[in-house]
């Protein structure tokens, strides 16, 4: 058993770091879902649309897909989601073509569920 990061063979450290980062990302997503579902003055739909804009601005593809799903789950329409995408493209200067495709694919994937 490896007790310490220094004990990891050099040729495996990149894999270990990738696994660690993925675990942290997953934990953050679960925590974010709990935060977004708490009652507040903002509706769950609005909080999820804001989270989508933030995920787009930070160019985190997996979070974008998750936020599209959560937005749709709380009643966001395709038009509302695309409006968030337009604002993110303008404000954060994200790659429009790539993220438009990601968002459209996510909407298409989840539209039957919501």
Question: Which stretches of residues belong to each language-model region?
Answer:
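Acidic, glycine/proline-rich low-complexity segments that act as flexible tails and inter-domain linkers
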Residues: 1-46, 99-114
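Short, surface-exposed loop and linker segments with low hydrophobicity and enrichment for Pro/Ser/Thr
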Residues: 45-48, 80
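Amphipathic, charged-and-aliphatic alpha-helical interface segments
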Residues: 47-61
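Mid-chain, well-packed structural core segment of small domains
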Residues: 58-85
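C-terminal structural segments of small proteins and small subunits
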Residues: 82-107
